[in-house]
Amino acid sequence: MPAEQQRWAEIAVDAAGDAQEIVGALLLNTTGCQGYATTATTATGYLPVDERLENTLLALKSALADLPRAGLAPTVPDITIRFVAEADWANAWKQYFKPQTIGRHLVVKPTWEAWQKRPGDVVIAIDPGMAFGTGLHATTRLCLQALENHVRPGVTVADVGTGSGILAVAAALLGAAHVSATDVDPLAVRIARENVALNGVTDRVDVAEASVPPTGTFDLVVANILADVIKDMTPALFAALTPGGRLIASGIIDTRAIDVADHLAASDFADLTTSREGEWVAVEGVRSR
């Protein structure tokens, strides 16, 4: 008889608006899910159906119940559970990731989707891995648009908190002479290196397990992380820039944008500007000295 297939639980959590970032983080960190995807309204993860599932779900529900009390969500996010077979789950999350045109010329496509390249297209092929889901959050798109606006042939770029490596790859394909990508997560480092190789830019992009590049200064620093992390890392981000260099910071919910911008202004960043998509904001500033 054929072996019985492993069953998986598809856990979908409401994650709209201001709560999206924290709900996604709770789903990943509380459950350790082995597949992850997001849409504008939902965060979805996949867990094996085993003796640990019940306790894992109880822990997730408890963490979500704390969000309104902490002022992080208006109500307790709803959870929907669906069971899928082994043959289905590994590819189920991929349905959310389709080719997207971003800015004027950038196209981000998953490795499993075809794309007919048009004149002027800069095509970024990404396999984000299940740990990084679809990889095209609004903050990623904001950073990609900013890179398209500011990367010129020959510039140097640092990508702090690189994740899947998408921003580092984009900078290289847009003409950067050198890109230094860093992440404190060893899994991110591995996946980013794979995506760098996939796009043929290993000669211009290096990926290291670190919070910021340990040496050198850069014309552009992009940091798509979190508002509080950006504030904590401001001295290091400032030091990583050449005088007159530009910081592109995102991962910022709109309710925190003024706070982050004021902090950067007080830290000798000038010419501050913001861009936004939905509830998410990118803040740019220039090192003034």
Where are the model-predicted features located?
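Core SAM-dependent methyltransferase catalytic element
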Residues: 270-289
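A short glycine-rich, Lys/Arg-flanked "PGG" loop and its adjoining helix->strand segment in the class I
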Residues: 231-246
